[in-house]
Amino acid sequence: MTSQTTAIGIDIGGTGIKGGLVDLSSGELISERVKLPTPAGGKPADIVETTKAIVARLAAEDPTAPVGVCFPAIVKHGFTMSAANVSKKWIGLNAEELFETGLGRSIHFVNDADAAGYAESQFGAAKDKAGLIILTTLGTGIGSALIYNGVLIPNAELGHLEIDGADAESRASYAAKEREELTWERWAKRLQRYYSHVEFLFTPDLFIVGGGVSKNYQEFMPLLDLKTPMVPAVHRNNAGILGAAALARPGAA
Protein backbone atom coordinates (compact mmCIF):
# COMPACT_ATOMS: atom_id res chain seq x y z
CA MET A 1 0.00 0.00 0.00
CA THR A 2 1.10 3.58 -0.54
CA SER A 3 1.21 6.42 1.93
CA GLN A 4 -1.90 7.92 0.25
CA THR A 5 -3.99 5.15 1.82
CA THR A 6 -2.11 4.49 5.04
CA ALA A 7 -0.86 6.42 8.06
CA ILE A 8 0.80 5.65 11.36
CA GLY A 9 -1.13 6.44 14.52
CA ILE A 10 0.51 6.73 17.95
CA ASP A 11 -1.49 6.88 21.19
CA ILE A 12 0.46 8.05 24.24
CA GLY A 13 -1.00 7.26 27.65
CA GLY A 14 0.13 7.35 31.24
CA THR A 15 0.99 3.64 31.35
CA GLY A 16 1.54 2.64 27.73
CA ILE A 17 2.41 3.99 24.30
CA LYS A 18 0.86 2.11 21.41
CA GLY A 19 0.81 2.47 17.67
CA GLY A 20 -0.23 0.89 14.41
CA LEU A 21 -0.28 1.30 10.66
CA VAL A 22 -3.83 2.16 9.60
CA ASP A 23 -5.69 1.63 6.33
CA LEU A 24 -7.34 5.04 5.95
CA SER A 25 -10.08 3.75 3.67
CA SER A 26 -11.40 1.20 6.18
CA GLY A 27 -10.02 2.28 9.56
CA GLU A 28 -8.45 -1.12 10.10
CA LEU A 29 -5.01 -1.84 11.48
CA ILE A 30 -2.87 -3.42 8.78
CA SER A 31 0.07 -4.05 11.08
CA GLU A 32 0.40 -5.58 14.49
CA ARG A 33 -0.40 -3.14 17.28
CA VAL A 34 2.91 -2.21 18.86
CA LYS A 35 2.83 -1.29 22.54
CA LEU A 36 5.62 -0.31 24.93
CA PRO A 37 5.39 0.86 28.56
CA THR A 38 5.38 4.60 29.13
CA PRO A 39 8.76 5.42 30.73
CA ALA A 40 8.59 5.97 34.48
CA GLY A 41 7.99 9.63 35.26
CA GLY A 42 6.63 10.36 31.78
CA LYS A 43 9.38 12.87 30.97
CA PRO A 44 9.44 14.47 27.51
CA ALA A 45 12.78 13.11 26.27
CA ASP A 46 11.97 9.58 27.44
CA ILE A 47 8.52 9.52 25.85
CA VAL A 48 9.90 10.85 22.57
CA GLU A 49 12.52 8.08 22.51
CA THR A 50 9.93 5.37 23.13
CA THR A 51 7.68 6.86 20.46
CA LYS A 52 10.62 6.91 18.06
CA ALA A 53 11.16 3.18 18.59
CA ILE A 54 7.51 2.41 17.82
CA VAL A 55 7.43 4.63 14.72
CA ALA A 56 10.61 3.00 13.42
CA ARG A 57 9.03 -0.45 13.63
CA LEU A 58 5.86 0.66 11.87
CA ALA A 59 7.61 2.80 9.25
CA ALA A 60 9.52 -0.28 8.13
CA GLU A 61 6.24 -1.41 6.53
CA ASP A 62 5.56 1.95 4.84
CA PRO A 63 8.43 4.45 5.16
CA THR A 64 6.46 7.36 3.66
CA ALA A 65 3.28 6.96 5.73
CA PRO A 66 2.39 10.20 7.57
CA VAL A 67 2.42 10.08 11.37
CA GLY A 68 -0.19 11.26 13.85
CA VAL A 69 0.43 11.37 17.59
CA CYS A 70 -2.27 11.80 20.24
CA PHE A 71 -1.43 12.84 23.78
CA PRO A 72 -3.22 13.23 27.16
CA ALA A 73 -3.15 17.03 27.24
CA ILE A 74 -4.86 20.12 25.92
CA VAL A 75 -3.02 20.82 22.66
CA LYS A 76 -2.92 24.35 21.26
CA HIS A 77 -0.86 25.10 18.15
CA GLY A 78 1.38 22.16 18.98
CA PHE A 79 1.94 23.19 22.61
CA THR A 80 0.81 20.96 25.48
CA MET A 81 -1.10 23.20 27.88
CA SER A 82 -1.76 20.53 30.52
CA ALA A 83 -0.48 17.07 31.47
CA ALA A 84 -2.56 14.07 32.60
CA ASN A 85 -0.66 11.09 34.05
CA VAL A 86 2.66 12.28 32.61
CA SER A 87 5.37 14.65 33.85
CA LYS A 88 4.36 18.25 34.52
CA LYS A 89 7.38 19.21 32.40
CA TRP A 90 5.08 18.86 29.40
CA ILE A 91 3.05 21.90 30.41
CA GLY A 92 3.80 24.84 28.11
CA LEU A 93 6.12 22.76 25.94
CA ASN A 94 6.17 22.92 22.14
CA ALA A 95 5.55 19.19 22.06
CA GLU A 96 4.83 18.93 18.36
CA GLU A 97 8.22 20.44 17.55
CA LEU A 98 9.89 18.20 20.14
CA PHE A 99 8.43 15.07 18.53
CA GLU A 100 9.24 16.24 15.02
CA THR A 101 12.86 16.86 16.00
CA GLY A 102 13.11 13.53 17.80
CA LEU A 103 11.43 11.52 15.05
CA GLY A 104 13.09 13.41 12.21
CA ARG A 105 9.78 13.89 10.39
CA SER A 106 6.63 15.99 10.38
CA ILE A 107 3.71 14.79 12.50
CA HIS A 108 0.15 15.77 13.33
CA PHE A 109 -0.19 16.28 17.10
CA VAL A 110 -3.59 16.12 18.79
CA ASN A 111 -5.36 15.61 22.12
CA ASP A 112 -6.21 11.95 22.81
CA ALA A 113 -9.97 12.44 23.26
CA ASP A 114 -10.10 14.51 20.08
CA ALA A 115 -8.37 11.67 18.24
CA ALA A 116 -10.89 9.16 19.60
CA GLY A 117 -13.79 11.36 18.54
CA TYR A 118 -12.38 11.80 15.06
CA ALA A 119 -11.92 8.03 14.76
CA GLU A 120 -15.61 7.53 15.50
CA SER A 121 -16.57 10.17 12.93
CA GLN A 122 -14.46 8.57 10.21
CA PHE A 123 -14.71 4.86 10.94
CA GLY A 124 -17.19 4.27 13.75
CA ALA A 125 -20.47 5.23 15.35
CA ALA A 126 -20.65 8.68 13.71
CA LYS A 127 -19.51 7.72 10.21
CA ASP A 128 -21.53 9.65 7.62
CA LYS A 129 -23.50 11.41 10.39
CA ALA A 130 -24.22 15.11 9.87
CA GLY A 131 -24.52 17.79 12.52
CA LEU A 132 -22.90 18.06 15.94
CA ILE A 133 -21.53 14.85 17.42
CA ILE A 134 -20.23 14.75 21.00
CA LEU A 135 -18.01 11.90 22.12
CA THR A 136 -17.44 11.43 25.83
CA THR A 137 -15.02 8.90 27.30
CA LEU A 138 -15.90 7.71 30.79
CA GLY A 139 -12.78 6.56 32.61
CA THR A 140 -10.44 8.10 35.19
CA GLY A 141 -12.01 11.38 34.09
CA ILE A 142 -14.41 12.44 31.35
CA GLY A 143 -12.77 13.13 28.04
CA SER A 144 -14.71 14.77 25.23
CA ALA A 145 -14.58 15.64 21.56
CA LEU A 146 -16.82 17.74 19.32
CA ILE A 147 -17.24 16.87 15.65
CA TYR A 148 -19.36 19.12 13.41
CA ASN A 149 -20.16 17.78 9.94
CA GLY A 150 -17.00 15.69 10.05
CA VAL A 151 -14.75 18.54 11.22
CA LEU A 152 -12.99 18.32 14.59
CA ILE A 153 -13.50 21.24 16.98
CA PRO A 154 -10.51 20.77 19.31
CA ASN A 155 -10.07 21.06 23.06
CA ALA A 156 -13.62 20.62 24.30
CA GLU A 157 -12.88 19.87 27.94
CA LEU A 158 -16.47 19.03 28.87
CA GLY A 159 -15.39 16.86 31.79
CA HIS A 160 -14.60 20.08 33.65
CA LEU A 161 -18.08 21.54 33.44
CA GLU A 162 -19.32 22.39 36.92
CA ILE A 163 -22.24 20.23 38.02
CA ASP A 164 -23.67 20.61 41.53
CA GLY A 165 -20.66 22.67 42.61
CA ALA A 166 -18.00 20.22 41.45
CA ASP A 167 -16.10 19.20 38.32
CA ALA A 168 -18.40 16.83 36.45
CA GLU A 169 -15.70 14.20 36.14
CA SER A 170 -15.12 14.14 39.91
CA ARG A 171 -18.70 12.88 40.33
CA ALA A 172 -19.73 11.24 37.08
CA SER A 173 -16.60 9.53 35.73
CA TYR A 174 -16.29 5.76 35.86
CA ALA A 175 -13.51 6.24 38.42
CA ALA A 176 -16.03 8.01 40.68
CA LYS A 177 -18.40 5.05 40.34
CA GLU A 178 -15.64 2.66 41.36
CA ARG A 179 -14.26 4.87 44.12
CA GLU A 180 -17.65 5.40 45.75
CA GLU A 181 -18.89 1.88 44.94
CA LEU A 182 -21.98 3.27 43.22
CA THR A 183 -24.59 0.96 41.75
CA TRP A 184 -25.36 1.36 38.06
CA GLU A 185 -28.60 3.08 39.04
CA ARG A 186 -26.94 5.64 41.34
CA TRP A 187 -24.22 6.31 38.81
CA ALA A 188 -26.82 6.74 36.07
CA LYS A 189 -28.45 9.53 38.09
CA ARG A 190 -25.15 11.41 38.03
CA LEU A 191 -24.73 10.73 34.33
CA GLN A 192 -28.25 12.05 33.79
CA ARG A 193 -27.32 15.36 35.43
CA TYR A 194 -24.17 15.58 33.36
CA TYR A 195 -25.59 14.69 29.96
CA SER A 196 -28.70 16.82 30.49
CA HIS A 197 -26.43 19.82 31.11
CA VAL A 198 -24.31 19.12 28.03
CA GLU A 199 -27.47 18.61 25.99
CA PHE A 200 -28.83 21.97 27.19
CA LEU A 201 -25.62 23.76 26.23
CA PHE A 202 -25.03 22.21 22.81
CA THR A 203 -28.22 20.53 21.51
CA PRO A 204 -26.14 17.84 19.77
CA ASP A 205 -27.36 15.39 17.15
CA LEU A 206 -25.66 12.37 18.71
CA PHE A 207 -23.84 11.37 21.89
CA ILE A 208 -21.18 8.66 21.63
CA VAL A 209 -19.94 7.08 24.85
CA GLY A 210 -16.44 5.62 24.88
CA GLY A 211 -14.03 4.34 27.48
CA GLY A 212 -13.75 0.79 28.79
CA VAL A 213 -17.12 0.98 30.53
CA SER A 214 -18.87 1.49 27.20
CA LYS A 215 -18.79 -2.27 26.70
CA ASN A 216 -21.33 -2.38 29.56
CA TYR A 217 -23.53 0.29 27.99
CA GLN A 218 -26.69 -1.78 28.51
CA GLU A 219 -26.23 -1.37 32.27
CA PHE A 220 -26.60 2.42 32.24
CA MET A 221 -27.69 3.87 28.89
CA PRO A 222 -31.30 2.59 29.17
CA LEU A 223 -31.53 4.42 32.53
CA LEU A 224 -30.89 7.82 30.92
CA ASP A 225 -33.69 10.06 29.67
CA LEU A 226 -32.32 12.37 26.98
CA LYS A 227 -33.66 13.98 23.82
CA THR A 228 -30.41 13.22 22.02
CA PRO A 229 -29.71 9.70 20.72
CA MET A 230 -26.83 7.97 22.53
CA VAL A 231 -24.74 5.05 21.26
CA PRO A 232 -21.61 3.25 22.48
CA ALA A 233 -18.32 3.86 20.72
CA VAL A 234 -17.29 1.30 18.12
CA HIS A 235 -13.57 1.73 18.70
CA ARG A 236 -12.25 1.60 22.24
CA ASN A 237 -8.68 0.32 22.57
CA ASN A 238 -7.62 1.48 19.11
CA ALA A 239 -9.57 4.74 18.88
CA GLY A 240 -6.58 6.99 19.58
CA ILE A 241 -4.43 5.19 17.03
CA LEU A 242 -7.10 5.37 14.33
CA GLY A 243 -7.95 9.02 14.96
CA ALA A 244 -4.34 10.19 15.10
CA ALA A 245 -3.62 8.36 11.86
CA ALA A 246 -6.69 9.79 10.13
CA LEU A 247 -5.77 13.33 11.18
CA ALA A 248 -2.25 12.85 9.79
CA ARG A 249 -3.68 12.42 6.31
CA PRO A 250 -3.07 15.55 4.19
CA GLY A 251 -6.21 17.67 4.09
CA ALA A 252 -7.83 16.01 7.12
CA ALA A 253 -10.15 18.10 9.30
Predicted regions and their residues:
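A charged helix-plus-loop insertion that forms the helical arch/lid used to bind
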Residues: T80-G92
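Glycine-rich nucleotide/cofactor/substrate-binding loop typically near the N-terminus or early
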Residues: F71
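ATP-binding/phosphotransfer module of carbohydrate and carboxylate kinases, centering on a glycine-rich
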Residues: M1-P66, V75-F79, E97-R105, A119-I134, ...
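General beta-strand structural signal in soluble alpha/beta enzymes
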Residues: I107-D112
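Basic- and aromatic-lined ligand-binding clefts that recognize polyanionic substrates
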Residues: I142
